[in-house]
Each structure stands twice: as C-alpha cells, then as structure tokens.
Regions:
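Hydrophobic "anchor" residues
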Residues: 1-2, 46, 130, 137
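Short, well-ordered, mixed-charge alpha-helical segments that flank or form enzyme active sites
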Residues: 46-48, 74-78, 100-104, 126-132, ...
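Proteins enriched for Cys/Gly/acidic motifs involved in redox and nucleic-acid/cofactor modification
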Residues: 82, 96-125
Length: 289
C-alpha cells in the first residue's frame, strides 16, 4: 500500500484527494501511473468551492486501474465520475458488492431515501419477551451480548429510544468499551415531551429525516417505538439478541405494527449474519423490500 485516505468530517477533503496527496510526485500529471486505486464510492464528478471533482484529480494522476465499490447516487455524479476516468484511458472495475454497500449504507440511504439507515436492536427471551411483567429487564442477555451492543453503538451516528423507555430505565445510551468511550453516538428521544439536556427529540418517526449529521440511527426501543418505526417502514436492519430463557407472561418486544395479512410478513427480511455470544444468539436481518 502506497497511500490511503478517508473523507473528512464535514465532507471535505474527499478520500481520493487525501490519498493522491500522499503519493510521490503528487499533483503532477500521471503521478499514479502503474498503480491501482481502490475506492468504496465512485469519485465525484462535481466541482465545489471546497475542492475540485475527485474524478478530475484521479484522471490527472492516471492510475492504471480504479476499483469502485458503489456508484454514487448523487445525480451530480451517478456514473459520470466513472465515465470521466474511462475517457482518460483508465481501466475501471465496478463491484457493487455487499461489503462496500454495507460500509456506505448510511450515505446511500440518505442520498436515495432522504433519511438515516435505521437498525433496530432487540434483546429478547426465547419467547420474544423483553422484560418481566413488572418491567424488570436487567439483564436478559449476558456480558458478551451487551458488549457486542456497545460495539454496534460505536458505529452509529445516533441512538434513539422512546419516551417510555427513557422514563422507566433512564438509559445512558453511551459506549462503555475501553478505548471507544469517545465514540458514543448522539442521543435522540422519540417523545412529545421536552428533551433533556444534551438529547435531541423528535415527535414522530418520520422526523428522523431532519436529524442533521445523522446517516446511521440505532433504535433500541422500547416496544412501542420499535413498532412505530416498523409500521412506517423505516427499519432497514434488525439486530436480534436472544437469550436461552423463557419468561412466559412478560412484556413483548413489539407493539402493533399494523400487519393485516400473514402473507405480507413473508419475504421482507433476509438473514445476514448469525453468531454465538456466550450463551446468547445474535442474528441480523436486512430488509429485502
């Protein structure tokens, strides 16, 4: 590896500009000759007050080959960046693979749907309960599962709970893994009440569109908040942590999601990952339609 770069906070400089700026003879024509460049997202084709189009910089540096993970859905680029590179005589390989799509899920969802990528986290007993009938829920899952949740939190821009969960559990909603404490996401409350200090509030799920700076959102409950997001088709991925216990008469993981026919529930989710976390099972599902 000769150099690497990643897009900086605020959107500029872009990853390509930083990577090219670190190679020998950077800024000169053909400075990347003989090299292969790998990018998760298609180099942009539009100029900006904060920097030139990345596809122009790459075309000028002229690596032999550019491997692109995903097309940029931004209409100012969408295929035009790749076209510019090919016109410059650069071989371009477009992967459109699952790994790069996953790494860009927040950006792609913002660009195409105008909202964050939403992951719903559920921690349940074998019979789908998230608490005892009296509300006791600490702890259903074990230490390894809870540590895994904190690792997922560290990957998110924001974390959301409903007002009922906030009042009942007073959750910290932070990351408590050594070395990752500074990666705690912004906290968001779904409520019609006043937001506590340091917490953003939305009154209904659709208002996630207006959460500035949030491309990925982790939804941690409770049952009514989770159901409201599912009912409005705002969940892209489900993380299910299941403990080997049976509660019986407890509190269900979900409220009413407005499902009218069983057939409508099928074919909507696909298994993405499964693993064992101590005595608990973790499975993730991604939306297929």
């Amino acid at each position: 590896m000769i150099s690497r770069g990643f897009t900086q906070s605020g959107g500029r400089p872009h990853a390509e500009a930083l990577a090219l700026g670190s190679i020998p003879d950077h800024g000169k024509p053909n400075s990347a000759a003989g090299m292969t460049m790998y990018v998760t997202l298609e180099p942009c084709a539009h100029e900006s007050e904060r920097g030139p189009a990345c596809s122009h910089l790459v075309a000028e540096a002229k690596p032999d080959r550019v491997v692109v993970g995903q097309l940029d859905p931004d209409p100012r680029t969408n295929g035009q960046g790749i076209e510019r590179l090919r016109k410059a005589g650069i071989e371009v390989v477009l992967l459109e693979d699952d790994a790069s799509r996953k790494s860009l899920c927040g950006f792609l969802t913002r660009e195409t749907l105008g909202r964050p990528y939403v992951t719903l986290k559920l921690a349940t007993s074998l019979d789908g309960q998230i608490a005892m009938a009296d509300g006791t829920s600490r702890w259903i899952t074990g230490d390894r599962a809870r540590a895994h949740v904190h690792a997922q939190r560290a990957r998110q821009d924001a974390i959301l709970v409903g007002g009922g969960t906030w009042r009942a559990d007073k959750p910290r909603l932070d990351v408590r893994l050594p070395g990752l404490e500074e990666r705690s996401p912004d906290r968001v409350l779904l409520s019609r009440g006043v937001a506590p200090d340091g917490v953003r509030v939305i009154n209904e799920p659709a208002q996630i569109n207006a959460l500035e700076g949030v491309q990925t959102l982790y939804l941690e409950g409770g049952a009514e908040a989770a159901a409201s997001f599912l009912a409005q088709d705002l969940v892209d991925e489900i993380h299910l942590y299941r403990a080997p216990i049976v509660i019986g008469c407890g509190r269900s993981a979900l409220g009413d999601i407005g499902l009218e026919a069983l057939g409508d529930a099928h074919g909507r989710w696909a298994l993405a990952e499964t693993r064992q976390l101590g005595s608990d099972a973790f499975t993730s599902y991604v939306r297929t339609r």
